[in-house]
Regions:
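Acidic, polar ligand-binding/catalytic clefts
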Residues: 64, 68, 72-140, 196-219, ...
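Bacterial N-terminal signal peptides that target proteins for export
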Residues: 1-9
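C-terminal functional modules
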Residues: 270, 276-337
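Sec-exported extracytoplasmic/periplasmic mature domains
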Residues: 30-31, 67-75, 92, 96, ...
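Extended ligand-binding regions for polar small-molecule ligands
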Residues: 61-64, 68-70, 132-135, 139, ...
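Sec/Tat signal peptide C-region and signal peptidase I cleavage site
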Residues: 15, 19-23
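Extracytoplasmic small-molecule ligand-binding "clamshell" domains
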Residues: 30-99, 286, 301, 324, ...
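Bilobed "Venus flytrap"/periplasmic-binding protein-like clamshell domains
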Residues: 36-45, 55-70, 104, 123-175, ...
Length: 337
């Protein structure tokens, strides 16, 4: 019996030792020399490769910001295109380091192992219809056929909204963004539903964009953000504070253009952000100039928003809830101190 107990103790020690020496996500990324980021392959403004295969978008730039913090190079990132229904499985499998793919933070997703680090875009679900349909409200869609993507909160919200308003629904479900958009554009459905940001983006892809309109109703809360696996608190914090650094930089007026000059600032908050004072990078396993690297390479949150989905982009979405907390929005970062 004593030898059996000793064997069990030895086995338990071996398992514990193996677990404790397993490389974390940060070390794995450093070893391979790049970050692997799960991305949307077809949503303009958030994640979409250009004609040269270069990914661009708000979510893409958050991935590049993480790469900049780690490698001082925003291009040391591989983008893995992922369909909506495959997001939880691929994240859990370890194929990607982080998922930043217009994904709604929900209770069921978090309890299933997707740990959301914050909200990089506050959104809500809406509807798009052809103007010739003569509908000016989602409440007039009783009996309509609606194109929707499978495996999304959008699909669930659609059913809830029609049921709550005692309307008949014909949901026409597709596996990918591209299939859903194509079906609506071809006339397969009366309406198309997704996050409002996605509607403005997808409208640009229609054969005749001016023939379509986004209805006024927003039927859900869609807090979109990055998610990581639940087993690596250091990595969770790196992804989380990358976003907070982007927000803090905008709040303090630190931009891609002036970040070098701002290192000379006497403002203590700016000096802490840029690593001139303190040693806040150490707690994350990063260099002390981690946030400086982020801003130098990708800019602050406001700059990322403007060029990808804001007034400086073809999509031209107003900041709305995504403005800073002191400008009528919800974007807010804890202090770096």
């Amino acid at each position: 019996m004593r030898s059996h107990i000793a064997w069990l103790a030895g086995a338990a020690f071996a398992v514990a030792a193996a677990f404790s020496t397993e490389a974390g996500t940060l070390d794995q990324a450093k070893t391979r020399g790049q970050l692997i980021c799960g991305s949307n392959p077809g949503l303009a403004g958030f994640g979409l490769p250009d004609d040269q295969g270069m990914y661009k978008g708000l979510d893409v730039d958050e991935c590049r910001a993480i790469a900049a913090a780690i490698f001082n190079d925003p291009n040391k990132v591989k983008f893995l295109p992922i369909n909506a229904k495959d997001r939880p499985t691929i994240l859990a499998s370890g194929e990607i380091d982080v998922l930043i793919r217009n994904t709604t933070w929900t209770l069921s997703r978090q309890t299933a192992g997707m740990f959301f680090t914050g909200i990089n875009y506050y959104d809500g679900q809406g509807f798009m219809v052809r103007k010739k349909l003569g509908v000016d409200s989602a409440l007039k869609l009783d009996g309509a056929s609606v194109c929707v993507q499978q495996g999304t909160t959008t699909e669930l919200n659609l059913a809830d909204y029609f049921r709550a308003n005692n309307m008949k629904l014909e949901a026409v479900v597709f596996a990918t963004d591209a299939e859903t958009t194509k079906a609506y554009d071809s006339g397969r459905c009366d309406a198309y539903t997704t996050d409002a940001s996605g509607l403005y983006s997808e409208r640009l892809k229609m054969s005749n964009p001016d023939d379509h309109m986004v209805l006024p109703e927003i039927i859900s809360k869609e807090p979109l953000g990055p998610s990581v696996r639940k087993d690596d608190i250091q990595w969770f914090q790196i992804v989380q504070w990358t976003h907070y650094a982007l927000i803090t930089a905008e709040e303090l007026g630190v931009t891609q253009a002036n970040v070098d000059e701002k290192r000379k600032s006497d403002n203590p908050a700016i000096r802490r952000l840029l690593g001139v004072e303190g040693s806040f990078g150490e707690g994350l396993g990063l260099t002390n100039d981690w946030a400086y690297r982020i801003i130098k390479h990708v800019g602050n949150y406001g700059e990322i928003f403007e060029r990808n989905v804001g007034m400086g982009s073809p999509i031209k979405i107003a900041r709305g809830l995504n403005a800073l907390w002191n400008k009528g929005g919800l974007q807010y970062a804890p202090p770096i101190r």
